[in-house]
């Protein structure tokens, strides 16, 4: 099967946004206009094409990023719909890794919201070019220029409108195209009656002003255009488009467009903008990787002629075909039935079938080419972030980093039958989602599951019930506290058991000191002159790593510390790896009195949106939860409070906010960083954990 669309005519894009900005609806309309769907499904009726897991249809939010292929004006557009709910940021992170461009959807009433900031930051990390689509222009309180302002203020992004709306709220009935200097008027809400007309007289002045600003902004990034602009020469539509494209693909400029996906206004123009301004796989830098044996850096260009290299970015369990591995092909060609090497794990894999995915239907294809996104059936050992490549030309592409879970709950199966199935369910679910962990607590024997938030874990338990038919009781959520040292000290650990027969002897002096936040545990060997033989040194490191897992104050993992083995002694006969492991863990316990250990807790960035009259109550409530208010602003006729609050104080906040505001307040929160717990709280945590 020959390549259907050239690389220049391929776009891999993500659609990203805050929850409820109308992202799934926008994707839905794109699929409708590109001829993939015959009837439009509304999210609020629970019939959307992209939201195909049962929970998504019930809750009206998108949880797993479904990858869909659509066609528009001779181009193939692969779309990944990403969830906007904060608990699912990992889904966004992994889809951004394999995209070439993205559409950020904003709500015209709210502009940039906290989750938008998180997703925007992630996209900046991966250098993803973006177009901003200001959606819901038909909504009460919709304000296009206010929304553009929030992009400047909150994201510090160089964003400029390339369109202006004609009217707003229920008067929104057209769009001015500043690039082509024309307008599109909508005769109805079905998107079937669109007329391209001259810009209406009453909007001409504003359109000229904003077109001038647009040309100036683009010219600043393009010397040739700047010269023409300064010399007063006219810049043609083609030159302006080329300038916008160049500045957008180099992530220096973000075009802003507007519309209402729900009312079918502006979606076709959004598709045109995706093709005009977002990059093809040829416009983004070639992907870099390393050779497995030498760690030498190599690159793979977007070309069918290069050796095959792809990145697995999502694993899903499908009721009909089993395990599906979604992957992005960076270079080369892959045929179904062929063998590839998983270079990350060093295993050989056979690709059984290759499927091109529509939101929840699929089409089998025999070949995938560079720049494509598809799903493979039959891969056994591949997990998220693994590289698949040609067996004769190995390469390891840069993998993805995932955040550690911040919340955990104990779960127990309701019956013996459930117990057997629960193990399978948990291992499949953790294979699909790298931010979800399941383990057995050594002391209590309970199964503990951990994730990114209450909703995340709710959905996991829900999926266990529906997909794996496992009924389970769920305990109260627990916060993932951490411990760390605030002071440095040199401490001794000595383990000696020598009473007749073969004894045990290990003796170490270790210098502990705090490490930079986020650096984790670092172990260094500073032994001189062999006072501790070389073969026992890894045992000291391993002994410390084991002991760190259970902390020193309240049994939480110790993080961000450095340990240097500086001295010690050994016994020719009685020393063993085990003895040195124990000596190292004794040194860590001895450090408690000298290294000022503290407990750290996850802090959440919280944004509460409430009617003005509840302001006092809500501020008081935030403070009573040990929160720090970091800013307030008016948004339309509502007030927005931004605060930093410990996760432990946020349990059940949704219920309390509902009752405090008669159901009129909403909030969202996202994990921000770890911070030291106040002494009084720390004492309580230690008491509770020691069962006092």
From Swiss-Prot:
Q: Which PROSITE patterns match?
A: G_TR_1 (PS00301), G_TR_2 (PS51722)
Q: Where does the protein end up?
A: Cytoplasm
A GO molecular-function term, please? Answer: GTPase activity
Which residues participate in GTP binding? Answer: 17-24, 81-85, 135-138
> Which Gene Ontology cellular-component terms appear in the entry?
cytoplasm
Residue span(s) of domain tr-type G: 8-282
Q: Which processes are annotated in GO (biological process)? A: ribosome disassembly
Entry-linked InterPro entries: EFG_II, EFG_III, EFG_III/V, EFG_IV, EFG_V, EFG_V-like, EFTu-like_2, G_TR_CS
* Keyword terms of this UniProt record: Cytoplasm, Elongation factor, GTP-binding, Nucleotide-binding, Protein biosynthesis
Family note: Belongs to the TRAFAC class translation factor GTPase superfamily. Classic translation factor GTPase family. EF-G/EF-2 subfamily.
Q: What does this protein do?
A: Catalyzes the GTP-dependent ribosomal translocation step during translation elongation. During this step, the ribosome changes from the pre-translocational (PRE) to the post-translocational (POST) state as the newly formed A-site-bound peptidyl-tRNA and P-site-bound deacylated tRNA move to the P and E sites, respectively. Catalyzes the coordinated movement of the two tRNA molecules, the mRNA and conformational changes in the ribosome.
Cited HAMAP family: EF_G_EF_2_B (MF_00054_B)
What is the official name of this protein in its record? Elongation factor G
Provide the species name: Bacillus cereus (strain ATCC 14579 / DSM 31 / CCUG 7414 / JCM 2152 / NBRC 15305 / NCIMB 9373 / NCTC 2599 / NRRL B-3711)
Q: What gene makes this protein?
A: fusA
């Amino acid at each position: 099967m020959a390549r259907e669309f050239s690389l220049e005519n391929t776009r891999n894009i993500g659609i990203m946004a805050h929850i409820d900005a109308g992202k799934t609806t926008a994707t839905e309309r794109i699929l409708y206009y590109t001829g993939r769907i015959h009837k439009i499904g509304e999210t609020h009726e629970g019939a959307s094409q992209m939201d195909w897991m049962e929970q998504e249809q019930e809750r009206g939010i998108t949880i797993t990023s479904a990858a869909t292929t659509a066609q528009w004006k001779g181009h193939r557009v692969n779309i990944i719909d990403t969830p906007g709910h904060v608990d699912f940021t990992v889904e966004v992170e992994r889809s951004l890794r394999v995209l070439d461009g993205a559409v950020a959807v904003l709500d015209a009433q709210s502009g940039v919201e906290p989750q938008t900031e998180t997703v925007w930051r992630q996209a900046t990390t991966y250098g993803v070019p973006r177009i901003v689509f200001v959606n819901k222009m038909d909504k009460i309180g919709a304000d296009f220029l206010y929304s553009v302002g929030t992009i400047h203020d909150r994201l510090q992004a160089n964003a400029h409108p390339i369109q202006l709306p004609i009217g707003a709220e229920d008067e929104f009935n057209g769009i001015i195209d500043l690039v082509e200097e024309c307008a599109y008027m909508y005769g109805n809400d079905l998107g079937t009656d669109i007329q391209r007309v001259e810009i209406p007289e009453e909007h001409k002045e504003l359109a000229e002003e904003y077109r001038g600003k647009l040309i100036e902004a683009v010219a600043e990034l393009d010397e040739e255009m700047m010269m023409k602009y300064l010399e007063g020469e006219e810049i043609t539509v083609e030159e302006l488009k080329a300038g916008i494209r160049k500045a957008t693909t180099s992530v220096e400029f973000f075009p802003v467009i507007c519309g209402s996906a729900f009312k079918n206004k502006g979606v076709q123009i959004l598709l045109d903008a995706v093709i005009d301004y977002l990059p093809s796989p040829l416009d983004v830098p070639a992907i870099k990787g390393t050779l497995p044996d030498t760690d030498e850096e190599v690159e793979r260009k977007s070309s069918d002629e290069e050796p095959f290299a792809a990145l697995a970015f999502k694993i899903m369990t499908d009721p009909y075909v089993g395990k599906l591995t979604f992957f992005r092909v960076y270079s080369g060609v892959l045929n179904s039935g062929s063998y590839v090497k998983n270079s990350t794990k060093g295993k050989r894999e056979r690709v059984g079938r290759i499927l091109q995915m529509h939101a929840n239907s699929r089409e089998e294809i025999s070949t995938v080419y560079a720049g494509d996104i598809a799903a493979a059936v039959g891969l056994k050992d591949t997990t998220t972030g693994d590289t698949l490549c040609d067996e004769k030309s190995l390469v390891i592409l840069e993998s993805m980093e995932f955040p550690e879970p911040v919340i955990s709950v104990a779960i127990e199966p309701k019956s013996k039958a459930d117990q057997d199935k629960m193990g399978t369910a948990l291992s499949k679910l953790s294979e699909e989602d790298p931010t979800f962990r399941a383990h057995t607590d050594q002391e209590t024997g309970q199964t503990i599951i951990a994730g990114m938030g209450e909703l995340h874990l709710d959905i996991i338990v829900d999926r266990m019930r529906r997909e794996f038919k496992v009924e389970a009781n769920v305990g109260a959520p627990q916060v993932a506290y951490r411990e760390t040292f605030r002071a440095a000290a040199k401490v001794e650990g000595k383990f000696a058991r020598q009473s007749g027969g073969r004894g045990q002897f290990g003796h170490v002096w270790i210098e502990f000191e705090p490490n930079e936040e986020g650096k984790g545990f670092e172990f260094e060997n500073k032994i001189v002159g062999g006072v501790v033989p070389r073969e026992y040194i890894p045992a000291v490191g391993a002994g410390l790593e084991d002991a760190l897992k259970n902390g020193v104050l309240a049994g939480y993992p110790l993080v961000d510390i450095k340990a240097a083995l500086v001295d010690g002694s050994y016994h020719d006969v009685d020393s063993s790896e085990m003895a040195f492991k124990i000596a190292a863990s004794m040194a860590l316990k001895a450090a408690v009195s000298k290294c000022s250990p503290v407990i750290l807790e996850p802090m959440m960035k919280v944004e509460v949106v409430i009617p003005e009259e509840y302001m006092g109550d809500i501020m008081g409530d935030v403070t009573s939860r040990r929160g720090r208010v970091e800013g307030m602003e008016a948004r339309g006729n509502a007030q927005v409070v931004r605060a930093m609050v410990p996760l432990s104080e946020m349990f059940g906040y949704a219920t309390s906010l509902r009752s405090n505001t008669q159901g009129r307040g909403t909030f969202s929160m996202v994990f921000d960083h770890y911070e030291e717990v106040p002494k009084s709280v720390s004492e309580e945590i230690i008491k509770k954990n020691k069962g006092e």
